[in-house]
Amino acid sequence: LLLIMRERTPITTKLLNACTNLKLIITSGMRNQAIDLKTAKQKNITILGTDTHSNPTAELTWALILGLARNVREETENMYQGYWQTTLGTELKGKTLGVIGLGTQGTQVATIGKAFGMEVIAWSENLKIADAEAKGVLAVAKEDLLARADVVSIHLVLSERTKNLIKYDDLC
């Protein structure tokens, strides 16, 4: 039996014990944090992951940022009602992009922000100043990022450590 799943799908001891013929699990990523690895190893179940692509995440992030900055939804609705460009939107050049989590995806988002002429600042608990500088980004404290950024983009794995890391009041 072969199981192909998203990497966040829980594969528990109960499920592994119920699948008596399971030999291989293939996930859509490499973290495999949702799999009971100990039980899988005991049952000689092989676990493989696929290489993830961060480009689609960065592209979607920028689609959403641009959509908000240029009022795409509102302008599309107005166009269908016969109106043309009722708002100006916001120019991103000269604005500040705050990236929380400067890993692969955060770095790609930061690179695109710089191409738009944005100042890019970043924070994560383990971000080293030299690493940020090597990427052309300024490392700042989380509070400073939240106070200065015109746009905040979060690129952290959701975990108990990161849950509630940023609250509503932090963004207002």
Q: Over which residues does each language-model region extend?
A:
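Phosphate-binding beta-alpha-beta segment of Rossmann-like dinucleotide-binding domains, i.e.
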Residues: K43, T50-T96, T111, A115
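An N-terminal-biased, well-structured beta-alpha scaffold segment characteristic
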Residues: L1-L48, A147, K167, C172
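Rossmann-like adenosine-cofactor binding region
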Residues: I11-L15, N126-C172
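N-terminal Rossmann-fold NAD(P) dinucleotide-binding loop
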Residues: G106-T107
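Glycine-rich Rossmann-fold phosphate-binding loop(s) that bind the pyrophosphate
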Residues: L102-G103
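Phosphate-coordination loops involved in phosphoryl transfer and adenosine-cofactor binding
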Residues: L22, K93-V99, Y168
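Short beta-strand elements at the ligand-binding edges of bilobed clamshell
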Residues: T46-T52, L138-K142
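Conserved beta-strand positions in the Rossmann-like core of class I SAM-dependent methyltransferases
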Residues: I121
